[in-house]
Amino acid sequence: MAEIYYDNDADLSIIQGKKVAVIGYGSQGHAHAQNLRDSGVEVVIGLKDGSKSTPKAEEAGFRVLSAAEAAQWADVVVILAPDQVQRTLYADDIRANLEAGNALVFGHGFNIRFGYIEAPEGVDVIMVAPKGPGHTVRREYEAGRGVPVIVAVEKDATGAAWPLVLSYAKGIGGLRAGGIKTTFTEETETDLFGEQAVLCGGVSQLVQYGFETLTEAGYQPQVAYFEVLHELKLIVDLMWEGGIAKQRWSVSDTAEYGDYVSGPRVIGPHVKENMKAVLSDIQDGTFAKRFIADQDAGAPEFLALRVKGEQHPIEATGRELRKLFAWNASNDDDYVDGEVAR
């Protein structure tokens, strides 16, 4: 059974007694910084010169420094930049400004798990990873609630890393909902697997194949879109509320029976074997090496795959349909970069 921590398990005064630098002011960065500040913690923001986030952070009342200056000032350095830029940011601006007794905080274990970042002697390495986007982390905190968090300690150089990680998690509101104890390895490998095999890669491919199957059989693209993509939210919401059992309880008997007899025909044992291969590539570092090598080369594979995905017929159909509904009219205008949700 997982070990779960709550507010009563943490001493907020620990993080209140630290100077915290949040490196990055995107979705997670703004939530961590604002929640910590509202919990009585002294926080500065570290950003590169010319960052588009600087005006936002300053408008929110934060002092903005360079990443190097912020790291030098702080006792606790929170790295919330995208995975692919963390190691360069760390090497160029952060590492030389760390000293014994400091702590590095991560929101995801990628760079530690795969060895792209290595902390110097005497520096704690901890993780607090909210299981929700930053705007939800902030909204729930303001409402007196919290988003569950994953907490881990990779390196306890000071002997006080666990009290610190729990105090930090309490400071952002995570222990109101609960903090699940894990390791950097478990968080990284399961997170990447979930994204690739189910939540992003698996679902995206399933939806595209479903759309193609219907349209190639002569059905209208608009009808196909509703059946395989639009209604997915209704099903996922039910699963989120009460698991697969509630989803099956809520749908018609026809849909439930079709679930049992046709689901295994589509997602058969061969899919599970493919999932195992995906997990193996994550565990042995194959995926990480491929991703970082592509990013270092300017992301040619990544960008080509993005363009290919955007050109799938389901995207044009979706844009056409979403314009018809007032409650959905602006949903195609509220994102720009792939990192917006992180």
Curated annotation (Swiss-Prot):
It comes from Leifsonia xyli subsp. xyli (strain CTCB07). Disulfide bonds: none annotated. This is Ketol-acid reductoisomerase (NADP(+)). The active site is at 108. Residues 183-328 form the KARI C-terminal knotted domain. The gene is ilvC. Substrate binds at residue 252. Involved in the biosynthesis of branched-chain amino acids (BCAA). Catalyzes an alkyl-migration followed by a ketol-acid reduction of (S)-2-acetolactate (S2AL) to yield (R)-2,3-dihydroxy-isovalerate. In the isomerase reaction, S2AL is rearranged via a Mg-dependent methyl migration to produce 3-hydroxy-3-methyl-2-ketobutyrate (HMKB). In the reductase reaction, this 2-ketoacid undergoes a metal-dependent reduction by NADPH to yield (R)-2,3-dihydroxy-isovalerate. SUPFAM superfamilies: 6-phosphogluconate dehydrogenase C-terminal domain-like, NAD(P)-binding Rossmann-fold domains.
